[in-house]
Amino acid sequence: MDAGMDLYIGSNEERDRVKEKLKEILLKQLSNPNVSTLLIAAILLDNEGRANNLPFNYNEDPNYVYVDEVIGLAIANEIAGTKAIFNFRFYDAKKPGIIGELDRKGFMFLDDAIAGLLAGCMSKVFE
């Protein structure tokens, strides 16, 4: 949740309300079977990558492999549609909080999945 708020640029007076709304939306979306299944897929793919069971060098995170972004985009789109897809690119590029931590620890899929989750939920906050 903190990573979602790291990129919040609204007024400080609204910050607590936005954070509470984000929490509510996050909890709701985690029970969405499409979102939760994509999050599970990201975790499983990271596990398979670490075990060298994917058809590319997982540790290099090669440019020609973009399925990790596809997972993040799918999560964002499921939650809040087109606006969340644009917001995903912002979270993916800035990598605030846990997203950056996951990226630095080599979680090729989960960092993008969480970026999609937060981008979608933050987009939903402002509907």
UniProtKB/Swiss-Prot annotation:
**One Pfam family linked to the record:** PgpA
Report which superkingdom the organism of origin falls in.
Archaea
The record's Gene3D superfamilies line, in alphabetical order, gives:
PgpA-like (1.10.3760.10)
| Annotated SUPFAM superfamilies | YutG-like (SSF101307)
- GO MF terms held by the record: phosphatidylglycerophosphatase activity
The parts of the chain that form a coiled coil are none
The record's annotation in InterPro entries points to: PgpA-like_sf (IPR036681), YutG/PgpA (IPR007686)
Q: Example GO biological process term?
A: lipid metabolic process
Q: What is this protein called?
A: Uncharacterized protein MJ1330
Species of the source:
Methanocaldococcus jannaschii (strain ATCC 43067 / DSM 2661 / JAL-1 / JCM 10045 / NBRC 100440)
